[in-house]
Every structure is written in structure tokens, then in C-alpha cells.
């Protein structure tokens, strides 16, 4: 690998690599913790030298704080000495007796694994920077949230929304290709079940387990099996516009419908029913409305279900699956916008005290594990092509964020066999985007948000990537042409 490309690869996947490879993560954390402790020792000595009156109590506090720092520094130094820079970054270091002794002295009663990496992870969790500063009475003051910080929060929220939207579209694309069934449901909360819902923090988790096990039974499998290969879901919370009442929109994607599922329009003169009764009764806290999602070439048509009609008796307009996917993502965008609203605004609209308790909680978008992250393997691609895919933009693929994440994961695996010192030699400087933008605002009279952020990130247009990278996107079926269709109608109703 060329030196320039290798440096760019490490810079591109640095955050992924430190999260994936235990040896590299520990080396970085040991270095950061060593710098932190040295800085705290300096601050402690400076504070002591500035004391005008030293009584016995002050000296005792100083001695205990100094002893605490010495214990932590001894553990950090010993762990640093055990790191083998010649070993690969995915290597796991065996335990050392002295490290174990120091760890048990600092973290008594805390269990740890069979490697030094697991012991170090437990130490960092038990003693974060905030706790050490609290013990030394050196807590950092809360930073003021200025215009830059508020703008960065909005940008992060927008990025999360776009990422979830792309994951939903990709998951539904994969489920359609596999011939799965789509069910759109709305979960509500009944007044007489609000107390039971408030008392059960795992109500939603239990509901999705119930549906997953129903699918397993329909396939003749044990309910103890994992249902990730036959059932996927997305759940988006929403607050009603009129009264602020909490409810959820759910998309079920199942390989096999639960037992008892049948065409609701079979034998009817007017085929205007779409509810699937086999999904009802699984949510014990209110009402549900599970609706079969119908579109062109769906699994229901292959199963022989009749095509439904609308309220006027006309056959429903046939849309491609992409339209359904884009329609579902509007709920994700809407929920993201609603997070900006204050909880008090929701509570003002709500007259039920039990519902007001629900509104105090923070409900997030829930989904199956690794929802929408599946793409064709990138193991055969070169590091140069992977680096290009990790920098693509929307005009190359509407699922550009998923492509970028998968490319970075593959690059992270590719560099896993390299020695630690080779990676650390090209370690990138981690800069704070917040501080960088603040500095640019002071230097630039006419500051532009978008151009400044764009200049800090490397992105490639469709014409800038190689033919091999472009061919991968085409073969994966995720080009803008493949995902062009958008929804123009509502897929709800009976």
C-alpha cells in the first residue's frame, strides 16, 4: 500500500479502528489517560502552592488526592509497559499479575475478563475522567452553548435523520428482494392500560419479541431461536398534533406471516379490508391497526391475496416498493423534528395525568439490530476503491452513508493485521470541529456555515470515483435510478 493512500486510509477509519481493534483502542486510551493524569498532577501541585493557609485537614486532603493519582498512574504505566508495539492492532494482551493487583486496589470487587484489554476497559468504565476530576475537586465548568454549538447540534440531528432514512430504504429493498411481507401498524395507549405501561419499562421490547416468536412458530421453529433472520422491524414514536397523545408507527417485515393469517377480502363483495387480524392482540396496552402494505409484485400477490380497493370502490393505485419505503421514512423525519419540541408543550395538550407521565420519558426510534446495514461484500475491493467508497456523496447513491460505513468497516478489517507502531506512526490529529469553526468565524468576516463544513470533509462526486467503485454501486442495485420512485399517496386505511 502506497504511503499516501495508507495515511489517508488510517485517517478515514481512525474512529472505526479504535472502536474495533482492542490493542489499538487500549494504546490510544492509555496515552490519553497518561496525559490527563499528568495534567491533573500539575494542577494539584499548582493549587497547593497557591494555598496561603495549610492546616492539617487541607494537607490530609492533598495527601489522599496525591495517593489516588499515584495509584492511577502506576496502573497506567504498567499497562503501557505491557503493550507490544510490534504486535497487530487486533491482538489481545494476556493478563499481568501486577496489573491485576493494581486494578483490584483501585476497583475493588469489579470483575474483569481474561485479557489485559478487558481489564483496561473495566478500569476506564469505573473511573471515567469526570469521576477522577470529582474526586480531586477539579470538575470542568459547563461550556456555554453558543450559536456554533447549536448549529452543530442541528447538523448532527440532520445526519442521524438521513442515516436512519437510508437504513429504512435499504432494509425494505432487501426484504422486497427476499419476498418478505410488509405490515404497517399503529400502536396506541388505552386510558385503562396507562398505569401498566408506565410500570413496565420493557413494554415495547416484549411486544417485538412476541411478534418475532409468532413468526418463528409459523415457520415451525423453536421460540428460543433468534428471529433476526425472519423478522425485522422499525418503530417510530409520535405525539398527536391535537392532544399530544403518544403512539407508535411500526413497520413489520416478516418472512412468514403468523399462524391464522389470511386474505381479509376473501369472500367479500367489496374488497376494502387490509387489516391482518393475526397481528392483533399482541399489544396489551391499547389498540392496534395492522395493515397489509400492498405494492407492485408484493408477497401478498404471490400468495394469492386479492388486490384491495379504496373507499370509492376503485382499485388502489399500484406503486413500486420504493414508494412504500419513501413513505415510511417520512415518519422518521417527523419524529426527528418533534424531538426539538419541549416536553412541557406536549404536557400542556395532555389532560390525562397518566399520559403526562409517559410524556416525561424520552422515546427513541427502535429497530432491529443492524437494520438496513447489509450490502454486498466489499472484501474483494482494493483499499484504493474502498477509500473512494468511503467518500462518496448523494449523487453516487441515495444510500451513500451506508456505503461509506461498510467501506470503512472493510478498511478497518484490512488494517487489522498491521503492527501497532505502524498505525501509530501515521496517527491523525483529532481536531474538534466545534473549535475549528469558532476559529474560522473569528478570522473570516463573511463566514458561511455550509462551505466551511464542506471544506473540512472530503467528498467525491460520481464523476470523481473510479469505474470499479461505480460498478460496485451498480451491481448492488443502489444507484439513484434504482431508488428514484417516491411516494405520492397514503398507504394507510382499512
Curated annotation (Swiss-Prot):
GO annotation, biological process: DNA replication; viral DNA genome replication
Protein name: A protein
Gene name, Swiss-Prot/TrEMBL: A
Active site per the UniProt annotation: 327 (o-(5'-phospho-dna)-tyrosine intermediate), 331 (o-(5'-phospho-dna)-tyrosine intermediate)
Keyword tags: DNA replication, DNA-binding, Endonuclease, Hydrolase, Metal-binding, Nuclease, Viral DNA replication, Zinc, Zinc-finger
Organism ancestry: Viruses, Monodnaviria, Sangervirae, Phixviricota, Malgrandaviricetes
ZnF bounds (unnamed): 230-252
Source organism of the structure: Escherichia phage alpha3 (Bacteriophage alpha-3)
Function: The A protein is a specific endonuclease that cleaves the viral strand of supertwisted, closed circular DNA at a unique site in the A gene. The A protein also causes relaxation of supertwisted DNA and forms a complex with viral DNA that has a discontinuity in gene A of the viral strand.
InterPro entries according to UniProt: Replication_gene_A-like (IPR008766)
One term of GO molecular function: zinc ion binding
Amino acid at each position: 500500500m502506497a504511503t499516501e493512500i495508507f495515511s489517508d486510509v488510517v485517517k478515514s477509519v481512525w474512529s472505526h479502528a479504535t472502536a474495533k481493534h482492542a490493542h489499538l483502542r487500549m494504546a490510544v486510551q492509555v496515552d490519553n489517560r497518561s496525559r490527563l493524569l499528568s495534567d491533573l498532577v500539575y494542577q494539584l501541585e499548582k493549587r497547593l502552592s497557591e494555598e496561603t493557609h495549610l492546616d492539617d485537614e487541607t494537607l490530609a486532603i492533598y495527601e489522599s488526592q496525591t495517593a489516588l493519582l499515584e495509584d492511577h498512574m502506576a496502573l497506567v504505566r504498567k499497562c503501557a509497559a505491557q503493550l507490544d508495539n510490534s504486535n497487530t492492532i487486533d491482538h489481545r494482551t494476556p493478563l499481568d499479575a501486577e496489573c491485576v493487583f493494581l486494578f483490584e486496589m483501585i476497583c475493588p470487587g469489579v470483575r474483569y475478563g481474561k485479557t489485559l484489554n478487558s481489564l483496561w476497559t473495566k478500569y476506564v468504565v469505573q473511573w471515567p475522567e469526570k469521576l477522577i476530576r470529582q474526586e480531586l475537586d477539579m470538575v470542568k465548568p459547563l461550556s456555554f452553548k453558543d450559536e456554533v454549538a447549536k448549529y452543530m447540534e442541528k447538523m448532527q440531528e440532520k445526519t442521524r435523520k438521513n442515516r436512519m432514512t437510508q437504513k429504512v430504504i435499504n432494509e425494505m429493498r432487501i426484504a422486497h428482494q427476499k419476498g418478505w411481507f410488509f405490515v404497517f401498524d399503529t400502536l396506541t395507549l388505552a386510558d385503562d392500560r396507562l398505569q401498566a405501561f408506565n410500570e413496565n419499562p420493557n413494554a415495547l421490547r416484549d411486544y417485538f419479541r412476541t411478534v418475532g416468536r409468532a413468526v418463528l412458530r409459523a415457520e415451525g421453529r423453536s421460540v428460543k431461536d433468534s428471529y433476526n433472520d425472519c423478522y425485522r422491524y422499525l418503530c417510530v414514536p409520535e405525539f398527536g398534533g391535537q392532544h399530544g397523545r403518544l403512539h407508535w408507527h411500526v413497520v413489520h417485515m416478516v418472512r412468514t406471516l403468523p399462524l391464522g393469517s389470511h386474505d381479509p377480502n376473501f369472500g367479500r363483495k367489496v374488497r376494502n379490508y387490509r387489516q391482518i387480524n393475526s397481528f392483533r392482540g399482541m399489544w396489551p396496552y391499547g389498540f392496534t391497526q395492522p395493515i397489509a402494505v400492498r405494492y407492485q409484485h408484493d408477497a401478498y400477490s404471490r400468495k394469492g391475496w386479492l388486490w384491495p380497493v379504496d373507499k370509492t370502490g376503485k382499485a388502489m393505485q399500484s406503486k413500486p416498493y420504493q414508494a412504500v419505503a419513501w413513505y415510511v421514512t417520512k415518519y422518521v423525519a417527523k419524529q426527528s423534528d418533534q424531538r426539538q419540541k419541549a416536553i412541557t408543550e406536549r404536557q400542556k395538550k395532555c389532560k390525562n395525568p397518566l399520559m403526562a407521565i409517559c410524556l416525561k420519558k424520552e422515546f427513541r426510534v427502535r429497530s432491529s439490530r443492524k437494520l438496513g446495514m447489509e450490502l454486498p461484500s466489499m472484501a474483494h475491493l482494493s483499499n484504493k476503491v474502498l477509500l473512494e467508497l468511503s467518500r462518496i456523496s448523494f449523487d453516487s447513491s441515495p444510500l451513500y452513508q451506508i456505503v461509506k460505513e461498510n467501506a470503512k468497516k472493510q478498511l478497518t478489517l484490512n488494517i487489522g493485521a498491521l503492527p501497532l507502531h505502524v498505525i501509530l506512526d501515521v496517527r491523525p490529529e483529532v481536531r474538534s470541529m466545534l473549535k475549528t469553526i469558532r476559529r474560522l468565524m473569528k478570522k473570516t468576516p463573511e463566514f458561511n456555515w455550509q462551505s466551511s463544513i464542506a471544506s473540512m470533509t472530503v467528498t467525491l462526486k460520481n464523476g470523481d470515483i473510479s469505474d470499479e467503485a461505480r460498478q460496485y454501486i451498480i451491481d448492488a442495485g443502489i444507484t439513484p435510478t434504482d431508488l428514484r420512485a417516491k411516494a405520492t399517496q397514503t398507504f394507510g386505511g382499512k
